[in-house]
Every structure is written in C-alpha cells, then in structure tokens.
C-alpha cells in the first residue's frame, strides 16, 4: 500500500485516490524564458518517477504539467532580445522538450500553456470578486484579499501574522494588506494584454495554475506537486484562490521535492555555480544525471558536484556491467523476493534510494551468474526509467579520459591481440596499461576481448 508524505499535513499518509484506480496529478512546470537548469531537471525526473510508479501500481494516471508562457521575466527577456514573447517561449519550449527526452522523461498527458486559458482565469477572478475575496485596486490591478480566507498559511504551517513578520513585503498603497497578491495586472505599454471587466491586462502567476488545474482535472483532485521553493507563496496562494472560489477542498496530497545545491551552496547565478541541463549533459551521459537524481530521496536536498556525478557514473556502470547479455525488459514478477522489496521501498513515499539498493543486490547475484537476477534487474530498472540500453552501448559510450573514441579503442585492442599472437607480451601489456590509464577496462574471455569505460 502506497504511503506519501503530504506537505499539507506534514505526515506520511496512506494514499487513497478520490476515484478508485484513477489518479489526477498536477505539477507546476517551467516559466519558459531560458534554458532549463538542474532544479528543473529534478522536477522533471522526480514527477516522471512518481507517474511511472503510480502506473506500475495499476493506477490510470492523468498527469498535467503546465507551461507559464506569459510572465514579467518572459516580457523582459523578449524585449532584450528584440523578439515577441510568443517567439521566445516557443523556442524555449522546444529546448525544454529536448532536455526532457534526453533525461528519459515521459511527456505529461496535458501540457497547458497559460495564454490558452485566460478566459478560465478571468472567470475564476470574477468568482473571487463576487465572493468578496478579491478587489479591484485604484491602479486597475485586481488583488486577492488574504484576510478573507482564514485558512491562509495552512500549507506553510504559519499564521498570517507570522507570514507578514517573516516576509519582506514592499508597502503598496494599492493593497489593503501587504500580503495580498495580484490576480490581474493592468496593462502596460508594449506588453501583451487581454480584455477584462477591469480593463486591459494580463493574469498574475498564481491564478494561472488554479484555472488550468480546475479546467483539466476538476475543482478537487488527488496530487499537486512541484519544487519546495513553490510551497510559499505560490502553492499557498493556489489553495486560497481555488478553495475560496469553489468552496471545496482543492488537493488531497501535496508533494514537494527538495532543493538542488551545488557543492553544498545554494545554486544561483550570482555565485557563479548555476548550471543548465545542457551544460551538465556536455560532461555526463543523460542516464547518469537521471540516476544521480533518483539516488537521492525526492524530499532531501540534492547536492550537485562533479565528484557526486562521477560516483553516480561508477555506480551505474556497475549495474550495466551486470546486464551484459541480458534481454530486453519484460513484465515484473512482483511475487519474487527482490521485486517485493523494491515495491516496499517505492510504496514508502517513493523511496528510490532503497529501491536502487535492491538493484545493486540483484547486480551482485547477476555477476555470480544468476541470469534470472539480471532479468529482474532489467525489469525493475524499467519501472523507474533506468537500465534499458544495451549494456555494451552504455559501457562504451562517450570518450575516454584521453579522448579515445570507440573506433580508436577497438584499433588498440586489435593491436594488442596481434602482439599476443606474436607472443610479444611486453607490447600487449603496454597497450593494456595505456588503455587502463585512459580509463578503459579490458576483459579477456573465451569469446575474445571486451571493453568498458571505468
């Protein structure tokens, strides 16, 4: 039975979907004005893993992950680039999809763009105004009145007074309370704008997700996820908007993945330790990056460093080494002891570190000649989107530390075999040592010599 740590209650709870056998899940996606970074990679991979596990558990999952394609940052970047916001966002949506494919992330069932749902946002804002939970300000912005929603702060675990004291909120004469947040922004010259009952303008960020999730999943659904940085204010504000407008529970289970840190420091452009997915993939195979993300529990901080990625590469290499000659993945026999342990780990709040430990147990058995263990390793890896390549393809991918590609390595192996045939063992050993220094491991067997990268 699956148990999930619910950020709303701060406890681990048994997962019971609203409709038996069906799960509806919404995850906050990208604001598309730049290339995706490591924090985005973690969101992509974590909720891909969650979706895969729910489906492996027999649920029909409807997974929605939105795209924010209108935002202050988008408008600013488009102006700097002398292009339209639409052209900018279209380009970075394509780049995002390329990154996801590289990381083995399955596409969501729905990927709504905010600009396609402005009518729904306007209807939701009108409901909030009618209920006395929102007001038009003198500057033609529309704000949510947090005083009107007594449960505000429930997700954060803080009262409104505590939130006011803890947040550095600029005094705005248009707001009735410093914590009030914008639902509709009045139009500014040169910015995209839509007609509304309050004049031309565009939606605020928070209302976008409330409107899109209600339109695609209904007013009350099972799981809402995203990065820990969105818990406040974004997700807190979503609850206030959605429950304030609809008068019912918004979401049953809130899931938040932990922060990504770089060498134990917060990742930021100002510190010069900010990495895009593209930059990381220039140094490391994409499956290594996915494996690195899944080795950590999704709620824990993830500390990025070259040393940790190198360690992940070595660990994944050990798993693939055990898969030499293994056939493609097939159905999992969940009654098998290893598979049952894997299920137990995943059902315990998606505990991927424990699940991956089971994979290493299977690899050890496979290395002792247990072909059934190798097949189970392959099958269980598939459940979380790992270990599906031909083992030799993974083990020989890329270039060596000395810059050797596969054809150059094969040529040196052929030269070594010629030296051995001529009984020139000194030359044979020299070539082996040279390749070892370049990070290439040779394995001599009855069928000849095979190789892999360390």
Curated annotation (Swiss-Prot):
Signal peptide: none annotated. Monomer. Its cofactor is Zn(2+). One of its GO terms (cellular component) is cytosol. It comes from Thiobacillus denitrificans (strain ATCC 25259 / T1). Binds 1 zinc ion per subunit. One of its GO terms (molecular function) is ATP binding. This is Cysteine--tRNA ligase. PANTHER family: CYSTEINE--TRNA LIGASE, CYTOPLASMIC, CYSTEINYL-TRNA SYNTHETASE. NCBIfam families: cysS. The lineage of its organism: Bacteria, Pseudomonadati, Pseudomonadota, Betaproteobacteria, Nitrosomonadales. The gene is cysS. It catalyses: tRNA(Cys) + L-cysteine + ATP = L-cysteinyl-tRNA(Cys) + AMP + diphosphate. It is found in: Cytoplasm.
């Amino acid at each position: 039975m699956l148990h999930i740590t619910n950020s709303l209650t701060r406890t681990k709870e048994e997962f019971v979907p609203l409709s038996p056998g069906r799960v509806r899940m919404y995850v906050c996606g990208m604001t598309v004005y730049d290339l995706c970074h490591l924090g985005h990679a973690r969101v992509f991979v974590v909720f891909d893993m969650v979706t895969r596990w729910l489906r492996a558990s027999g649920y029909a999952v409807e997974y929605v992950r939105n795209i924010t394609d209108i935002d202050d940052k988008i408008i600013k970047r488009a102006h700097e680039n002398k292009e339209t916001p639409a052209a900018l966002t279209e380009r970075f949506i394509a780049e995002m999809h390329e990154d996801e494919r590289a990381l083995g992330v399955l596409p969501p069932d729905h990927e709504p763009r905010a600009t396609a749902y402005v009518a729904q946002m306007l209807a939701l804002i009108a409901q909030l105004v009618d209920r006395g939970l929102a007001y038009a300000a003198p500057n033609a912005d529309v704000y949510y009145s947090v005083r009107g929603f007594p449960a505000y702060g429930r997700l954060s675990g803080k009262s409104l007074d505590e939130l006011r004291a803890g947040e550095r909120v600029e005094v705005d004469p248009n707001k009735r309370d410093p914590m009030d947040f914008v639902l509709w922004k009045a139009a500014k010259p040169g910015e995209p704008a839509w007609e509304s009952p309050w004049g031309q303008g565009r939606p605020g960020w928070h209302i976008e997700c409330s409107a899109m999730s209600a339109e695609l999943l209904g007013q009350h659904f099972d799981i809402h996820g995203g990065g820990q940085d969105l818990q406040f204010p974004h997700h807190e504000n979503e609850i206030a908007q959605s429950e304030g407008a609809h008068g019912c529970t918004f979401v049953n289970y809130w899931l938040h993945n932990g922060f990504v840190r770089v060498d134990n420091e917060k990742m930021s452009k100002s510190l010069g330790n900010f990495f895009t997915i593209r930059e990381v993939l220039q140094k490391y195979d994409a499956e290594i990056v996915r494996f690195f993300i899944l080795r950590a529990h999704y709620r824990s901080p993830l500390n990025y460093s070259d040393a940790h990625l190198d360690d992940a590469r070595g660990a994944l290499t050990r798993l693939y080494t055990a898969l030499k000659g293994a056939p493609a993945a097939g159905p999992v026999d969940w009654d098998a002891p290893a598979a049952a342990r894997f299920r137990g780990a995943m059902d315990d709040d998606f505990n991927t570190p424990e699940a991956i430990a089971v994979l290493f147990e299977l690899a050890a058995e496979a290395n002792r000649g247990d072909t059934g263990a190798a097949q189970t390793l392959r099958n269980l890896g598939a459940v979380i989107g790992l270990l599906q390549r031909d083992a030799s393809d993974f083990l020989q991918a890329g270039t060596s530390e000395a810059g050797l590609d596969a054809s150059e390595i094969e040529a040196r192996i052929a030269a070594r075999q010629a030296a051995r045939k001529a009984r020139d063992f000194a030359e044979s050993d020299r070539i082996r040592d040279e390749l070892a220094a370049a990070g290439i491991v040779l394995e001599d067997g009855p069928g000849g010599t095979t190789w892999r990268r360390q």
